Amino acid sequence: GRTVVNHLNQVFVDAVRATGGNNQYRFLMVCPYAANSTEPALAALEIPDDDRLIVSVHAYIPYGFALQNPGSDKWLASKPGCTSDIDTLAEVLDRLFISKGQAVIIGECGAMNRDNEEYRAQWAEYYFAKFKAIGIPCFWWDNGAFLSGETFGLFDRQLSQVRYPVLLEGMMKGASGETAAGSSAA
């Protein structure tokens, strides 16, 4: 598992760099086994020998709100049980990578639609602000699903419109760092 992924990460970096051209200057992303965001998986990640790498993790947390089906439709920043997974991941990523000068992104995140746009917006504002405070950009997983399955859809490609503008506003507030959540999330 993890040993194989660590080996493949180095093979990937070596292969891209060996092709020449601008590939010697490109930033490349590597991830732990399954892009897992747990501390054991992150601690087991061996960073390939290269100075232009970004660690990418996927983090749908807290699981009960973000991904579990069925799961909770409510999320409140005032409840430590709602924020603890986010706070812990930020601390772990900062300690293992950011504090050592290693770039990190949250390559996938999101909270499924449960007819709870306001709660999702509050979650997104807190989540994005928390990681913005330590220099980690977050990328919403917009899978285009609105009606069934893992409903992370945000932008309706058929109608060319944002389906959840309040959610998008929460993400943008958090990502800008110009929010009350940004100051309390740090």
Positions of predicted regions on the chain:
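Residue-level preference for long, well-ordered alpha-helices that form the structural scaffold
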Residues: 1-5, 78-86, 116, 120, ...
